[in-house]
């Protein structure tokens, strides 16, 4: 899978949409994202997944 950098988020697809759970805020206007979305697809070599913080092959 290819990785695309969007600010500090790495995705598998350039237009991938994200959902975050920003339940913690230590500083004003700087939320800490505790979770994101994962994109997976299955091909001949098995399932490949991409998370919001890294790409796995």
From Swiss-Prot:
Task: List cellular component terms (GO).
Answer: extracellular region
Q: Where are the disulfide bridges?
A: 3-19, 12-37, 40-49, 50-55
Which residues are in coiled coils?
Answer: none
Q: Which Pfam families match?
A: Toxin_cobra-type (PF21947)
Where is it chiefly localized? secreted
Q: GO MF terms on file?
A: toxin activity
Where in or outside the cell is it found? Secreted
- Keywords of this entry: Disulfide bond, Secreted, Toxin
Q: Its domain of life?
A: Eukaryota
Asked if the record carries the keyword ATP-binding, the reply is: no
- What tissues harbor this protein? Expressed by the venom gland.
Checking InterPro entries in the record gives: Snake_3FTx (IPR003571), Snake_toxin-like_sf (IPR045860), Toxin_cobra-type (IPR054131)
The family database entries (CDD domains) matched by this protein are listed as: TFP_snake_toxin
**What extra comment accompanies this record?**
Is classified as a P-type cytotoxin, since a proline residue stands at position 28 (Pro-31 in standard classification).
What family is this protein classified in?
Answer: Belongs to the three-finger toxin family. Short-chain subfamily. Orphan group XX sub-subfamily.
- Listed name of the protein: Weak toxin CM-1b
Name the species this protein comes from. Hemachatus haemachatus (Rinkhals)
